[in-house]
């Protein structure tokens, strides 16, 4: 089981262990992604994400 969260109507995080909320929306993982300082391909990964508009700064804010 992983700690998950959802954002309520006030914009606060509500933590849970469930994969979906009561109204069927998926919850988000509360754990950060794994990181390795020896990542050989980070430059290429960022280049591809920039090219296809997949960076979080290039996406609109999610509507909950």
UniProtKB/Swiss-Prot annotation:
Q: What is its main location?
A: nucleus
Instruction: Output this protein's name.
Output: H/ACA ribonucleoprotein complex subunit 3
**Gene Ontology cellular component terms for the protein in this record:** box H/ACA snoRNP complex
Q: Does the keyword Ribonucleoprotein apply?
A: yes
Recorded hits in Pfam families, A to Z, give:
Nop10p
Gene3D superfamilies associated with the record? 4.10.80.300
Q: Which UniProt keywords apply?
A: Nucleus, Ribonucleoprotein, Ribosome biogenesis, rRNA processing
Q: Which GO terms describe its biological process?
A: ribosome biogenesis; rRNA pseudouridine synthesis; snoRNA guided rRNA pseudouridine synthesis; snRNA pseudouridine synthesis
Disruption of the gene: reported phenotype: RNAi-mediated knockdown in female germline cells results in a cyst differentiation defect that prevents progression from the 8-cell cyst stage and oocyte differentiation.
What is known about its induction? Repressed during starvation.
Q: Where in the cell is it found?
A: Nucleus, Nucleolus
> How does this protein assemble?
Component of the box H/ACA small nucleolar ribonucleoprotein (H/ACA snoRNP) complex consisting of Nop60B, Gar1, NPH2 and Nop10, and associated with H/ACA-type snoRNAs.
Molecular function (GO) terms for this protein are: snoRNA binding; telomerase RNA binding
């Amino acid at each position: 089981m992983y700690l998950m969260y959802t954002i309520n109507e006030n914009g606060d995080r509500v933590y849970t262990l469930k994969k979906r909320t009561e109204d069927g929306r998926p919850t988000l993982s509360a754990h950060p992604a794994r990181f390795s300082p020896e990542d050989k391909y980070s430059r290429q990964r960022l280049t591809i994400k920039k090219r296809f508009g997949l960076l979080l700064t290039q996406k609109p804010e999610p509507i909950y």
